[in-house]
Amino acid sequence: RMIAGLEDISDGELYIGDKLVNDIDPKDRDIAMVFQNYALYPHLSVYDNMAFALKLRKMPKDEIDKKVKEAAKILDLGHLLDRKPKALSGGQRQRVALGRAIVRNPKVFLMDEPLSNLDAKLRTAMRTEITKLHKSLGTTFIYVTHDQVEAMTMADRIVVMKDGIVQQIDTPQDIYDSPNNMFVAGFIGAPQMNFIDVKLVEKDGEIYAQNDALSIKLNAGDCGALTSNGYIGKEVILGIRPEDIHIEDIFVDNSLDSTFEANVELGELMGAEIYAYLKAGNHSIIARFDGRYKLNIGDKLKLAMDKHRIHIFDKETQVAIRDEKVKETSK
């Protein structure tokens, strides 16, 4: 809303390209918006819906025709230009809404959950189309979504927000691999990251994460921040993603200092993989294994955590403790 100019900026400066736009009217910011409801004019054809904003600008007729047909070609709408919105499918209507934005050739596209009204299959197809469109236009897209799959698959950079406060700005891979805090860690990834209460204990110069059910030796490279910030002897939260818990004998046999036992409470076969719902002592854990593993309720499994993929979070602030200086989430 602040980028579009619909709400005043309380602090800081907003640039679009090299232009400071804090005090520029919304209509003069050269922004196009696409919403989840397509907001098409029902009495106008696809062509006229796409041309509407250009006609308001008093653009020459031949230039309007050229822009509409170029956008229609990009979006595969050429054969639909004479139809009314009621004769179109949901995906086609959304493409028309995109086309209406494209013909304006804006500096920024603002997209507010544009796919949320579509069914799952169509949403997947449109996700690909919008990504291709972004690559071909080379224009900045700012895309609001609650769907982490859309964020991970489409974004060059993700801004994760909670209650209006930025939690992390990073590439999808870094958001996934190095979350700043427990909110980001739990929000991105399905099934979500496991969070386990542990106490950090030092033995023979090594640091272990321990509780009633497990004792995991931490990777030496992760211990500097724990020691220098006084976490030894304190309770923290251990985070581990389901795919970083291993059942394979070769991994378990080579990870004796990060093994633990757990009982199977439920197995959900997803085809290529199986989600194992486990209990280790009083701790509920989800692991993701190859779908060919046969799991039976009540089985006792010997498992190993990939200690290079373990995350440690402060129990009170929920901020990740890493080698860089421990800091509060930026506000």
Give the label of every model feature segment.
Residues 4:
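Helix-to-loop junction immediately C-terminal to a conserved catalytic motif
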Residues 7-8, 15, 55:
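A position-specific signal in ABC ATPase nucleotide-binding domains
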Residues 10-13, 63, 163, 310:
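Conserved coupling/switch loops of ABC nucleotide-binding domains, chiefly the family-specific signature
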Residues 206-265, 293-331:
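Glycine/charge-rich catalytic "coupling/switch" loops of P-loop NTPases
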Residues 12-20:
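Conserved ABC transporter NBD signature motif
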Residues 178-203, 306:
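C-terminal boundary and immediately downstream tail of ABC-type ATPase nucleotide-binding domains
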Residues 24-187:
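ABC ATPase nucleotide-binding domains
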